[in-house]
Amino acid sequence: MTDTLDGGYADPIQAPGTLEADWQAWQGWAGLPEAALDAVTRVVVVAAHPDDEVLGFGGALAMLAASGTEVTVVAVTDGEGSHPDSDLVTASELVRLRTAETRAALAELGAADSTVVRLRIPDTRVDRFEDEVAARIAPLLDGADLLVAPWTGDVHGDHEAAGRAAVRAAASTRTPCWLYPVWMWHWAAPGDPRVPWRRAALIPLSSTALERKRAAVGRFVSQIAPLGPGPGDAAILPPHELAHHLRDREVVFR
């Protein structure tokens, strides 16, 4: 391993993360402007993997759906690479599981009638298909007020590549684009200079939206609970990690 800002871990996502209590105590929340959702009539939300859209933007999706906004979710990959060393679940079984989990989660958000577009790009290799992803997202933006995608600085290869492709698609169609972090809450610290806080905006969640988001996150059983006792079947998002995504606010970069 090479020395890094994360105490010797070459991969910040594998390093011990920032506690949610530290984020909750951060005084910087008060300085973030709010991102308005009231003018959005059609939104396209990009997820590098099934569950990203709920973890990073699920509360906002619940509020948008409740207001009558038309929702399209673009799953860039099917998430088949989440447990490559599992002795219990194959990649094809994960595709089936995670696709069903997405539909169940959207129903919990009150967005059961959302359109879900699966691009079927290979998991862990989105960077090799950025041109294709951008080209396939662009026509989906016809009539959309907003495109939302994973943050391009999230320190996760698929998230960053999906975000870059979305930014390109948005630019080509002149569609406003917001980017949501997922793993940033793990590897960054409050006020972290690696994070573009000047571009950040806050989305306060109503109590109903937060309740819906909690229920939606709970539908991703393949990610939040162990598939079995072996190390290759461990939960991808254990409770201390999920805590970052179950707070009463979400953040986007604009």
Model-derived segments and their meaning:
Residues 172-194:
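Short, flexible loop segments at boundaries between secondary-structure elements
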Residues 189-229:
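A conserved mid-domain beta-alpha-beta active-site/ligand-binding segment of alpha/beta enzyme cores
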Residues 15, 29, 184-186, 226:
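A generic structural signal for solvent-exposed, polar alpha-helical segments
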